[in-house]
Amino acid sequence: MARTAKTKKEISMEEALWKSADKLRGSVEPAEYKHVVLSLFFLKFASDKFEECRNKIIATHGEKYADMKPFYTQENVFYLPEESRWKYIIENAKQDDIALKIDTALYTIEKNNPALKGALPDNYYSRLHIDTAKLASLLDEINRINTDDKENDIIGRVYEYFLSKFALAEGKGKGEFYTPKCIVNLIAEMLEPYDGILYDPCCGSGGMFVQSIKFVEAHSGNKKKVSIYGQEYTNTTFKLAKMNLAIRGISANLGEMAANTFTNDQHKDLKADFIMANPPFNQKQWRAENELVDDPRWNGYEVPPTSNANYGWILNIVSKLSQNGVAGFLLANGALSDDGTELKIRQQLIENHLVEAIIILPRNLFYTTDISVTLWVLNKNKKARVVEQNGKLKRYRNREDEILFMDLRQMGSPYEKKYIELTEEDRAKVTSVYHNWQQEGYEETYENVPEFCYSASFEEVKEKGFTLVPSRYIEFVNRDENIDFDTKMKSLQGELKELLVQEEKSKADLLKVMEELGYGIN
């Protein structure tokens, strides 16, 4: 029941925002809609959190402390001067200078909150020259939205919704800007990033970081033990990520600027304990033929081909892993069996004992693409060792010559009409199998299950030409074995005969009616 209520809330919020954007028609280029709406949405979101905190301060300490910044800082809430508060904006919504007031509000918020440096648009609304009446109508629509949602990556989700509407018009790729919450949760639950450096080389709106920190907090961990590093190529998305993290009090190093991870790596010397990523799928011409050929990230491997960046992303991730680092990332299924240079790199990864698990995900998990997707798990140290993790000891067995394959295509529940999501129960089943397989005593806690999971040896993978397609290893039941085809065909024969008889009767009835009307069909 709780999930249904939440879904309805998210849908109504998205629909309201889309309705809001539609009010801009004729005043702003469609490609600008999302930026106009999202900055105002952020302003309302920040204001609502500020007012909530302000009321608590007044109730606890009295009115005279209501405008003391330290009280807001310690609660990870942005301090908003009066001219930056949503109430002030709404009260002045119909004024001729409302665009200037919005720009001033955003500038003042950034000036008063160092964590937002470089995150908010500068003099944006004044430059757009939006019709005052349409801007007032937009503000009124956004004012109706309830931003009180503590469980979802709201800003990222809303941003993704807008991207899905404009992706084709703007020439963007599909799926790389936002990763559905259930997938991020699955990756976090498998990797368990309780303590260390967490990195995302293509962080989008920062959703991976948001859900990872929530995972740590949900398991009584300390988010201060997690250091976050990320990089994002698109400037507007880079700003959004800074907003998304800052508004939740999450400290992060996203580099000096928005930049291409391959050609302008913002974290060249970084070694991460955990890497989570959803790179652009099948990115073409990601480098020139003579570019990056001697890049140190490819050391020990073939140079990834220019035709597809998938293995460029994989090797970038491998190069960033610490001695005991583990990575979970998404790629299109083609990367599992590509030939040529990709095959050579894949063989090297397997021979270097880096591939830990390959998990096929259900279709229709993403809002912007129905492409089939795989979750890869790489582990820099698959040897036997004992690790203390969030106050508990984990005894890992040696898995260097094994790879776990899983197929989740029969999992998932309907979500938002044509989409599906991996439920909490689905994820618990997957993570339980994965963690049991990793640890000592797995003989008692893990077993290969037809159509679900299989632990393959290095020799098996080698015999199959180093393909990582799960269906080459997982046993699938032949559901046709017990079918009596003669009986089945006779049954179908009878049904077809009955349908043909009915068709002839219907045809005769129709001809008779037309004849009686004087419009006979010869």
Give the positions of each predicted feature.
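Active-site lining segments that contact anionic ligands and/or coordinate catalytic metals
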Residues: 271-272, 308-310, 324-330, 355-356, ...
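Non-catalytic, mostly N-terminal accessory regions of nucleic-acid modification and defense proteins
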Residues: 1-194, 253-266, 360-363, 381, ...
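Hydrophobic alpha-helical scaffolding
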Residues: 128, 148, 202, 230-234, ...
